[in-house]
């Protein structure tokens, strides 16, 4: 249920079983010692609000499948060690701040499939200061205000289909999405041959706090 493993500092890894349908709100929130590569089974259709908020996971991979999945608000926000996200071919919606304030997140892949990505909501990837590349599926719909706000290193946007389809499907708010519009848009692409390096060294500021990373490890 809600908050089932919330604020559990003894939890260091988790294996989610095939057949699981829902990850509840706050399920693993504030589990700072939860680390490693998180795999979400292909049967999961909802990742609840703040489900993995402020955890130490290194990556997230969602299994491909036929059942659409929704990623709710703050599901993976403030994850200081999250380096990349492979979100499958079945994402219906990414809600507000779902991946916001992830300081070393380097790339995001949303594969092409039969599901329409109805919306990337406001602030979904805000303040992802190391985000360099994202792949969007053909049936991407609305990209809301500030969805990519304060992502100064966003350089490449890959789109799975043609420019004609992009113009037909995709509607991007002009409000605080300059980083998105300044990136290079690649049509008919499944992403780069090699995704950006996830190794990061430097200072990262999250709201009023500053953090030093050495070779992508928070010091």
What kind of feature is each model-predicted range?
Residues 8, 174-175, 189, 219:
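Amphipathic alpha-helical interaction segments
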Residues 1-4, 24-29, 48-51, 72-75, ...:
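Consensus positions within tandem repeat domains that build extended binding/scaffold surfaces
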Residues 197-219:
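Extracytoplasmic/secretory-pathway segments with low complexity and glycosylation-like composition
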Residues 8-22, 32-46, 55-70, 80-93, ...:
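Structural signature of tandem-repeat unit edges
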Residues 94, 120, 143, 208-215:
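Extracellular/luminal Pro/Thr/Ser-rich low-complexity repeat and linker "mucin-like" segments
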Residues 172-184:
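Short, conserved catalytic or adaptor-binding loops enriched in Gly and charged residues
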């Amino acid at each position: 249920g809600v908050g089932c493993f919330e604020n559990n500092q003894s939890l260091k890894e988790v294996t989610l079983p095939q057949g699981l349908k829902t990850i509840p709100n706050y399920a693993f929130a504030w589990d700072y010692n939860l680390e490693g590569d998180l795999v979400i089974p292909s049967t999961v259709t909802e990742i609840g609000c703040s489900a993995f908020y402020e955890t130490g996971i290194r990556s997230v991979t969602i299994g491909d499948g036929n059942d659409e999945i929704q990623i709710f608000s703050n599901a993976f926000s403030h994850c200081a060690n999250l380096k990349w996200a492979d979100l499958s071919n079945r994402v219906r919606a990414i809600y507000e701040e779902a991946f916001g304030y992830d300081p070393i997140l380097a790339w995001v892949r949303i594969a092409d499939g039969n599901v329409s990505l109805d919306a990337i909501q406001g602030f979904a990837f805000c303040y992802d200061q190391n985000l360099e590349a994202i792949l969007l599926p053909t049936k991407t719909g609305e990209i809301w205000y500030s969805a990519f706000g304060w992502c100064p290193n966003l350089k490449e946007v890959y789109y799975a289909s043609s420019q004609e389809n992009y113009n037909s499907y995709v509607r991007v708010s002009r409000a605080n999405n300059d980083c998105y519009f300044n990136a290079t848009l690649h049509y008919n692409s499944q992403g780069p041959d090699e995704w950006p390096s996830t190794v990061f060294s430097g200072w990262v500021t999250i709201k009023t706090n500053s953090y030093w990373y050495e070779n992508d490890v928070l010091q």
